[in-house]
């Protein structure tokens, strides 16, 4: 390749990066976990589905961009974004102070409380610290709900799992006394055949210092314009009714929050 062509390729590459950093990209690579029903999971046909995915597609349509979805294990989500593997995270990720030190976020697109589920027939009937003292509680590691469990239930034993599916299996088989996760995730599960073993006993008040500022779209530092585009799109689909149509497919309550 000649020097002129190399120079031109470099200029085009820099221009493309600059456009992406300015939030003007027309194609975005979006990461989700693909293992957190009903928010994001792989259907029987191998296609990504769920609330996060449908909201993400609606946001992309509103922004008039093409979104290319990819799955990533939870612990690798932020490192992958920072390394440039993805342009955005839409994966039920809470906007917390700790995460804001590494990445930026849009405004929240849902905000629902931590919820406790126990086996049917359990003698545990309350979500108080005393009621769960000495009990074994399962949670997905690295999530806001695992932080809530460790900060609030200090007299309980907290067992962390790589995915929500694994703690559900242990609860179903009597290896856990309770689990903690998002209301939407657990409500959908207990209302399915797979979750018929168990029941919700209560929710915890949303505390910003623990739960964060709701669930947002994550982007790299320096791409605040892209975050703003997502924020504007969130408000637009909320206003035009698209959000409600998607919400009502998955939840019995409005997940949007305050």
Give the ranges of each region predicted by the language model.
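Flexible hinge/capping segments at coil-to-helix
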Residues: 119-136
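Alpha-to-beta junction loops
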Residues: 64-66, 83-91, 135, 172-185, ...
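Short helix-initiation/N-cap motifs at beta->coil->alpha
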Residues: 53, 69-79, 124, 159-173, ...
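A ligand-binding cleft/hinge motif common to bilobed small-molecule-binding domains
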Residues: 76-79, 93-101, 151, 177-211
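Periplasmic-binding protein-like
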Residues: 34, 111-118, 191-231, 253-258
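Extracytoplasmic small-molecule ligand-binding "clamshell" domains
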Residues: 22-92, 101, 240, 253
């Amino acid at each position: 390749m000649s020097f002129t062509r190399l120079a031109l390729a470099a200029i085009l590459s820099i221009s493309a990066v600059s456009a992406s950093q300015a939030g003007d990209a027309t194609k975005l690579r979006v990461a989700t976990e693909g293992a957190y029903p009903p928010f994001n999971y792989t259907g029987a046909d191998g296609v990504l589905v769920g609330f996060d995915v449908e909201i993400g597609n609606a946001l992309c349509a509103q922004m008039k961009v093409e979104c290319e979805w990819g799955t990533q294990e939870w612990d690798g989500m932020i490192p992958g974004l920072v390394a440039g593997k993805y342009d955005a995270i839409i994966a039920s990720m809470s906007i917390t102070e700790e995460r804001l030190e590494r990445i930026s976020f849009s405004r929240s697109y849902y905000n629902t409380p931590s919820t406790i589920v126990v086996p049917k027939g359990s003698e545990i009937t309350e979500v108080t610290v005393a009621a769960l003292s000495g009990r074994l509680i399962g949670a997905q590691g690295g999530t806001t709900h695992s932080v809530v469990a460790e900060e609030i239930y200090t007299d309980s034993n907290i067992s962390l799992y790589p995915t929500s599916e694994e703690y559900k299996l242990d609860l179903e088989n009597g290896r856990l006394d309770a689990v903690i996760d998002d209301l939407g995730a657990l409500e959908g599960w207990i209302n399915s055949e797979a979750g018929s073993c168990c029941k919700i006993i209560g929710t915890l008040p949303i505390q910003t210092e623990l739960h964060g500022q709701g669930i947002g779209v994550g982007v790299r530092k320096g791409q605040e314009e892209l975050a703003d585009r997502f924020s504007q799109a969130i408000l637009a689909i909320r206003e035009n009714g698209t959000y409600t149509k998607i919400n009502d497919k998955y939840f019995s309550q409005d997940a949007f929050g305050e």
